Structure formats: C-alpha cells, structure tokens
Design a protein with these regions (language model features):
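Conserved Nudix-box catalytic region and its N-terminal flanking loop in Nudix hydrolases
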Residues: 19-62, 70-71, 189
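Nudix hydrolase/Nudix homology domain
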Residues: 32, 97-150, 155-157
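Conserved small-residue-rich
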Residues: 34, 89, 132-197, 204
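Active-site-adjacent beta-strand/loop module that shapes the phosphate/pyrophosphate-binding cleft
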Residues: 73-96, 121
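Hydrophobic faces of well-ordered beta-strands that scaffold small-molecule active sites
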Residues: 131-138, 160-162, 190-192, 206-209, ...
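Alpha/beta enzyme core
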Residues: 144-159, 195, 202, 212, ...
Length: 300
C-alpha cells in the first residue's frame, strides 16, 4: 500500500535580478544541511495559500502581499510522499532573515551555487530557470528556418523547438544543426522534435515530443531537456508522470495553421497553476504580472 501524501505549501520569492530565496535546513530538521524553498506542512483546515504565507513569515520574516499558485506536483521520498503546492510571491514586505537560525541565500535558479538541494524542490528550481518566451520553428527550407529562428531570438525567445515532421531523420538533423549555428550568438536552448538520438546527433539541448509520441513513450528519453505537446488535461498529467520539463498546450490545428503561414509560432509561459510549466500561444497565455520589489533586504 502506498503511503499517504503529505500536503506541503511552498513560497517562491525572487529579487529584482530573478534570484530565488533559499533556506538551509537546520540540524533539528530531517535532511539537515539541504537547501530548499521556504515552506512547510499545511495545517488541518488551512488552505495551501494561507500555509505558504504563514510558513514564509515564520521562516524568513517576509510577509507576502500578493501571490499566485504556480506548480503543484507529488514527489516521492524513500519513506514518504509529499504534494507541493507552490506559490510565486509577486509582492512582499520585510527583510529576509533566518528566524529559525537557518542560513538564507539568494541564488540563480539555473546555477544555485549552494548544495545539496532538497530533491523535492529540483523540479521547481528547474522550472524557474525556463524563459518566458518559446518559439516553434516549422520550415523544411534551412535558410527560411534559420531566419525564422533568428527572428524569434530577436523577439526574446529563450527556447526554440524545431519541427520538421515531414523530413527524413538525416535531413532533420542537418536542419537542426543549421538553426543551432544560426542562433548560437543569442544563446537560446534548442530542442528538436524527434528521437533522443536525433537530438544528440544534432547537438540540440534536448528533444520535443508531439502528443501522440508522448502517449506511446513508456518513460522519459535520455536527454537534458524534454518538452512535450499536450492536447488536454490527461496529456498534461501523463507528461508530468513521465518527467517532462515543460509542455506546450495549444490546439494542434491552430499550431499547424500558424506554422503554415509564417513558419514561426511564439508561445508564452502561462501563469496559471499546473503540474508542470506550460507554454501557450502568446496571444492567449495568461499574462505574467509579477513585479519584483526594488529592495530585497540584507541577509544575515
């Protein structure tokens, strides 16, 4: 019989650089010395949002005045399972201080610089390092595809997905190499829709799977970054279960129509709560209205 799930509320606080506030677990706690996002167990009868605000104040002295639900997922430790209800704090008051004697640190989510990180927080930290804009490039002509990818970078895309489903594998790999070289000065991460082997041969940062491939996949492929297309809620749940890093949620016909017109579809990170980070067509994605405070306090 599986163990019951412990409900946990977590708060993500970022400064004006986008750095994230982490706390080191004390010697009195399980997993002492591990670094984590502020948070803790949800009390009986308490809402997840109220628990996140309470835990943040109790641990760091920060009072959240505006926040929104962001991610919600289950993590299995060897002896227990926890469901993390993660909130992004948009506005807050106070000077961060370790009120329980713990050390605090502002870290770059992509390169935290502190270790070890509590395993249950790894997915959230990875998601915090994803960009806000993603571009899907769908051109079989290498020159036009490269031009579309460069245009996407000029518009701020930090992730590029290359789709060329009508190409043979070797053609797809050559196309991806051309695009990767073209956008290298801008530094986006590039994913190729295809197999893990194709992505590796192309020198891509990872692979991307359509919804049909997702449903056929028994497990996450061996790539650094894996994105998937999701048609509905069941696809999103499956993607989270398979260990996808993010999902594109867009009607396939709309995506295909956009690509036929220009070979480029821009998508924005959606601000609503989900099992994993979602990107939607830029015109329909929830606007991220987060504003970071100009003064973030001095740590002790």
């Amino acid at each position: 019989m599986s163990s019951p799930v412990i409900e946990v509320a977590v708060a993500v606080v970022q400064d004006d650089r986008g750095h994230v506030l982490l706390a080191e677990r004390t010697a009195r706690q399980v997993a002492a010395g591990f670094w984590e996002l502020p948070g803790g167990k949800i009390d009986s009868g308490e809402s997840a949002s109220a628990a996140a605000v309470r835990e943040l104040d109790e641990e760091t002295g920060i009072h959240a005045t505006a926040f929104r639900p962001w991610l919600c997922y289950v993590h299995a430790f060897p002896t227990k399972r926890v469901r993390l209800h993660i909130f992004r704090v948009e506005r807050w008051r106070g000077t961060p201080v370790g009120r329980e004697g713990q050390r605090l640190a502002w870290v770059d989510p992509a390169e935290p610089g502190v270790a070890p990180l509590l395993p249950s927080n790894a997915r959230a930290m990875f998601a915090l390092g994803l960009p806000q804009l993603l571009a899907v490039v769908d051109h079989e002509d290498p020159a036009r595809a490269a031009a579309a990818a460069i245009a996407a970078c000029d518009r701020g895309a930090g992730l590029i997905v290359i789709r060329a489903p009508r190409c043979a594998p070797d053609q797809r790999i050559a196309l991806a190499r051309r695009i990767i070289a073209a956008v290298a000065p801008a530094g986006p991460r590039v994913l190729l829709q295809g197999s893990a082997l194709e992505a590796q041969r192309a020198g891509a940062h990872g692979a991307f799977a359509c919804s049909a491939t997702l449903r056929r996949s028994p497990a996450r492929p061996s790539v650094r970054l894996w994105g998937v297309a999701c048609d509905d809620a069941s696809d999103r749940a499956l993607a989270a279960q398979r260990g996808a890093d993010f999902a594109i949620e867009a009607p396939p016909l709309l995506l295909a129509a956009n690509n036929r017109q220009a070979g480029l579809t821009m998508l924005r990170a959606d601000g609503t709560a989900a099992e994993l980070p979602l990107f939607k067509p830029a015109a329909t994605a929830a606007r991220d209205t987060s504003r970071f405070p100009a003064t973030t306090g001095v740590l002790t």
